[in-house]
Amino acid sequence: MTALTLDDMIQLQHLATVGKLVNGLIHNLSGPLQNIGMDVELLEMTLPNEQRGREELVEGIIQRLKRIGEEVDQMAHFIKNTSMRTGTRDETQDLLGVNHLLEQELVFLESNLYFKHQVQTDLKTKGELPRVCDLPRGAAQALGWFIQAIAEAMEMAGTKRLSLEVKMLPPTLHIIFSSDGSPFASSFTAQLNLDRDIADILAADGLNAGEKVTLAALKTCGGSLLFEEAPSGSRTTLTLPIVTP
C-alpha cells in the first residue's frame, strides 16, 4: 500500500475542515429556519381572526417580517462564508488582508461552525498587515487549522478566553495567542515546536492526526513556534515569513 504524502494529508485535512463547516452550517441553520416557520405559522393563524386596528396589525406584521429578514440574512452570511472554504485556493480570499482572514476565522469559531465550545476570542492588530497572498502558499489554510487546534486545546483545558495579537516585524508576521487560566495539556504543548523534521512532527506522540498535519503544513511554509507558560496563562507565538519582494 502506498503511503500518504504530506500533500495527500493536507488535502484530507482540508476536506475534514469543510465537513466540519458543513455540519456546523446545518446546525446553525436549523434554529433560524425553525424561527421562520414559527413566525409564518403564527401569521397564518392570526391574520384571519385578527381584531386589532389596521395600524396595530400592520406594525405587528412588519416586526415579524423584519425578524424573518434578519434570520435570512444570518443564513446567507453563514452559507457565503462556508462556500469560501470549499476550494483549496481562492483568489478572492488571497486579496484579503491577514486581519480580515483572522476575523473570519474567529467568526467561524464564535458561531460554532467548526465545533461547539465556550472559548471567547478577541483580536488586536498593530499597523498595516500583509495580504493573504503575501504569505507562503498554504500558510492561510494552515493558520486557520492552527487557530482551531488552539481553541480545541483550550476547551479541553477549561480555558475561557483566547486573545490574538498580530503585528509585522519585517520580513516576518507574528501572531501571538494568549490565554488565561488553566494550562494546556502537556502532551499538546510539548509538541508546539517546528524545529524538527516533518517526519518527526508526523510521528510525534500526544497529537491527533489533524494537529500533526497542521504543524507539518506550518513547517513547510517556513513557520516557527514559541510556547511560553506562566502562572497567569500561556503565550504561543507563530511566526510566518512574508514573501512579497
Language model: regions and residue ranges:
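Conserved signal-transmission helix
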Residues: 1-17, 187-190
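Conserved DHp (HisKA) dimerization/phosphotransfer helix of two-component histidine kinases, i.e.
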Residues: 44, 55-115
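Histidine phosphotransfer helical core of two-component systems
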Residues: 3-10, 29-73
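Short beta-strand/loop element within the Bergerat-fold HATPase_c
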Residues: 159-179
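Conserved catalytic submotifs in the C-terminal HATPase_c
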Residues: 118-130, 169
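Conserved glycine-rich
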Residues: 222-223
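Glycine-rich/acidic phosphate-handling loop/turn and adjacent ATP-lid/helix
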Residues: 172-210
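Detector for a conserved hydrophobic position within an alpha-helical segment of the HATPase_c
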Residues: 214-219
